[in-house]
Amino acid sequence: MKIKLNNISETMLITLYMRATDAKSEKPILNDKKSEEIISQIDYDFSKFKSAWASYYGVLSRAKVMDNEVKKFITKYPDCVIVSIGCGLDTRFLRIDNGKIRWYNLDLPEVIEKRKLFFEPNERVTDIAKSAFDSAWTKDIKLEGKKLLIISEGVLMYFEEQQIKQFLEILTDNFDSFEAQFDLLYKGTVKMSKKHDTLKNMEAKFNWGVKDGSEIVKLNPKLKQTGLINFTD
């Protein structure tokens, strides 16, 4: 089937392609067979990503690290609630589900519409078709006393700093307690969108980055940094 997406939403096909390519490799890092299944059903020119090896290893290492961190949280809180911000066609729930967690996928209506074409309904998974910058989505999250983890992968770098600040305020204004895991882009990379091995072929571009991971908590004094992982280590 043909898929048409605008600007930032189209970048979800980059990570989908990298995970699917990994699944076909002899020594897969994620072995994400669902991504391989999805990509086989999409009519899109994925060939423009074929030589993007820097993005390939970057996407996989980032996904693996985040999988591991999410698993640690689940081990500590087996019946927790997890919200995936800007989920795209992410398949993390299928990779880390323990049979008890409650999962929410948050993305724009056009993206959630596409998700429903590829994923079977699950009573513990809820799709929310709203913008992360619209605080109304927080009312859809049912915690019922459970611990909350908010994750976002490959999303924040496409927005302006003021938007990131707005998003963080939505989190701290609407949730009394939560843990968050975000991936951040190095500031020096922001101006290199047109040279980036995948973005050079797309409309989307990087808009925000940091010199140090601690910079994100400076945007909201209610946040406290509890850890930092360098994906290049």
Regions found by a protein language model. Give the residues of each.
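Conserved beta-strand signature within the Rossmann-like core of class I S-adenosyl-L-methionine
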Residues: L148-L149, L171-K187
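Short, glycine-/aromatic-enriched active-site segment of Class I SAM-dependent methyltransferases
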Residues: K187-A204
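Short alpha-helix
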Residues: E203-N230
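Short amphipathic alpha-helix with an adjacent loop that forms part of the alpha/beta core around
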Residues: S135-G145
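Short "lid" loop at the C-terminus of a central beta-strand within the Rossmann-like core
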Residues: F133, M157, L184-T189
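A short, conserved alpha-helix within the catalytic core of class I
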Residues: D127, A136-T138, Y158-D176
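A short beta-strand submotif of the Rossmann-like class I SAM-dependent methyltransferase core
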Residues: L148-E153, I164
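Rossmann-like AdoMet
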Residues: M1-V83, C87-K130, L143-E144
